[in-house]
């Protein structure tokens, strides 16, 4: 099941069964629907997309290593908790021509649901015929959607990375610590995140990521190139910072030429699945004597 965009793209060798012409792009400046449902005593908190202040390089009051361990532990918690939620996911990718207009698109909307016995599955609700001509999605795309994102630096993954403190920055109403993240080594057939994370300075939780999946994969006859992307999170039910929006506007550099792309993933309607019912101890009830 695909869960969030990472962005592996393959230069398209001839693609069959494509329909001519691009599909309509989403409205300019469109934003995901509100999905925040915080506690009544907590004001909604959102990692804003564009409002930010200058970065202060003064050392934090809390030891850096303590911050890192704390936000990694919270990432692990968020990853596990999100597996208990249903939500709607909309994913689109467009190629952009030299005039800045879309000339091909892949789009899919799906609901992430559960069977009655609690097994998670993805139900596609809308998937127009793709019109991409210059690139295509690869299996690595789908794998990265699930494994590289949305939670980039859990306790389990932390030993694989170098994490460096950058400074403190205000993202609208959120104070955040910034860290640069890079894999210590690149192991064969392993995928990693490389980029920057913003950690909310009160509860020490990641609220924004900016980077890419690495490494790019170039073999004879194919090139998987990964764009840079930003992922923004919102506070869900007053407890969890879940991803709600990912975007990318990048140029992919292939050996045969550059391809400009625009990608977007929206997550909406987060709802926790399941109801806990407590059952008492069974007792024998004897029938009344006649």
Q: At which residue positions do the language-model features occur?
A:
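Sec-dependent N-terminal signal peptides
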Residues: 1-19
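Structured extracytoplasmic
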Residues: 19-194, 201-208, 212-227, 235-238, ...
